[in-house]
Amino acid sequence: MARRFLYLTLLGAAILMIAVTSAGAHQIASNNGVSVQVHVNPDDEPVAGIATTVWVVRVKALKATFAWATCRCRMKVFDSSGTVLVDSAAKAPRIPVTFPEPHAYGITFSGRVKRSNGLWKPFKVTYAIRAASAE
């Protein structure tokens, strides 16, 4: 009985470690039936003062179609005080950005998807990210 409990405990811990490790690779947020997965180089831990790239890895819409050509997507990067660093049309899945200081930042990705009934449905997701110091 004790051996089985130990086995189940170790198995649960291993599953938890795998889940936590893989969850740290990308951030996923959802709004209005649209899930967006974002990644920031390197490994979602950008370094302040060094140019990096924000990648939109995946856009998945429930009962709707996403296309870069028609989404009217925008990417906005801002610091914790609300000062906007980048606010531009996102016509491709990557946007270059340089986080100036080692602080907390926000990334907002917005756009629209075309529903199966032909109507457009807007979405807007926001992520938190912290830029590390360039030691």
State where each predicted segment sits:
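N-terminal signal peptide c-region/cleavage motif recognized by signal peptidases
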Residues: V20-S22
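Bacterial N-terminal signal peptides
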Residues: T9-I18
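N-terminal soluble domains immediately following signal/targeting peptides that reside
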Residues: G24-E135
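Bacterial N-terminal signal peptides that target proteins for export
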Residues: M1-L10
